[in-house]
């Protein structure tokens, strides 16, 4: 049996239980460099726990998913946060779930507009990178160091994401 999921717009308020939305928020803007640069300050905080841990910056290249897509697993990082910021102006999906006793609950799906990134908080259940429509590259900031920083969970039943380009979602 499978369960249909709805796709929600990505907003700071809706995503707050899972981490931070990374976008050019006018409330956080300040001018620097003699007024030549707009700095959008402190949009998210990086978390890297454990002795010998550090923060690394990566580029991930995500292949587009085929929709409808069945979510059958989720992952989380118990020792650090993980952020994804797109390098191209392409929509992408963010799939998260609240923790229910060391297992993910029902997934929630957000569509990011291509100018929005996210920072998953430590221990937040999420699906791996979900590009839509084309190969997409992302700057990924996460933790490196000793210790197991990956837990996976496989659902007994699938949760289905409809095609995000379908007319019903516009």
Curated annotation (Swiss-Prot):
InterPro entries named in the record: RmlC_Cupin_sf, UAH_cupin, Ureidogly_lyase, Ureidogly_lyase_bac, Ureidoglycolate_lyase_dom_sf
Superkingdom field: Bacteria
Pfam families in the cross-refs: Ureidogly_lyase (PF04115)
Listed EC numbers: 4.3.2.3
Pathway(s) annotated for this protein in UniProt: Nitrogen metabolism; (S)-allantoin degradation
A GO biological process held by the record: allantoin catabolic process
Chemical reaction(s) catalysed: (S)-ureidoglycolate = urea + glyoxylate
Single GO molecular function: ureidoglycolate hydrolase activity
Cited SUPFAM superfamilies: RmlC-like cupins (SSF51182)
Keyword terms: Lyase, Plasmid, Purine metabolism
Protein family: Belongs to the ureidoglycolate lyase family.
Subunit structure: Homodimer.
Free-text function comment from the UniProt entry: Catalyzes the catabolism of the allantoin degradation intermediate (S)-ureidoglycolate, generating urea and glyoxylate. Involved in the utilization of allantoin as nitrogen source.
PANTHER family, alphabetized: UREIDOGLYCOLATE HYDROLASE, UREIDOGLYCOLATE LYASE
Official protein name in the record: Ureidoglycolate lyase 1
Protein species of origin: Rhizobium meliloti (strain 1021) (Ensifer meliloti)
Lineage of source species: Bacteria, Pseudomonadati, Pseudomonadota, Alphaproteobacteria, Hyphomicrobiales
């Amino acid at each position: 049996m499978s369960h249909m999921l709805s796709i929600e717009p990505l907003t700071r308020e809706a995503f707050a239980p899972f981490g931070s939305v990374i976008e050019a928020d006018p409330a956080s803007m300040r001018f620097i460099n003699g007024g030549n640069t707009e700095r959008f300050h402190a949009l998210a905080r990086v978390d890297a726990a454990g002795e010998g841990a550090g923060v690394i910056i990566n580029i991930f290249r995500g292949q587009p998913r085929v929709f409808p897509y069945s979510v059958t697993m989720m992952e989380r990082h118990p020792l650090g946060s993980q952020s994804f910021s797109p390098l191209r102006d392409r929509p992408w999906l963010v799939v998260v779930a609240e923790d229910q006793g060391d297992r993910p609950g029902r997934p929630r799906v957000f569509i990011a507009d291509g100018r929005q990134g996210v920072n998953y908080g430590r221990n937040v259940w999420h699906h791996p990178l979900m590009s839509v429509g084309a190969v997409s590259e992302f700057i990924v900031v996460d933790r490196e160091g000793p210790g197991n920083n990956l837990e996976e969970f496989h659902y007994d039943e699938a949760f289905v994401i409809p095609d995000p380009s379908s007319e019903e979602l516009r």
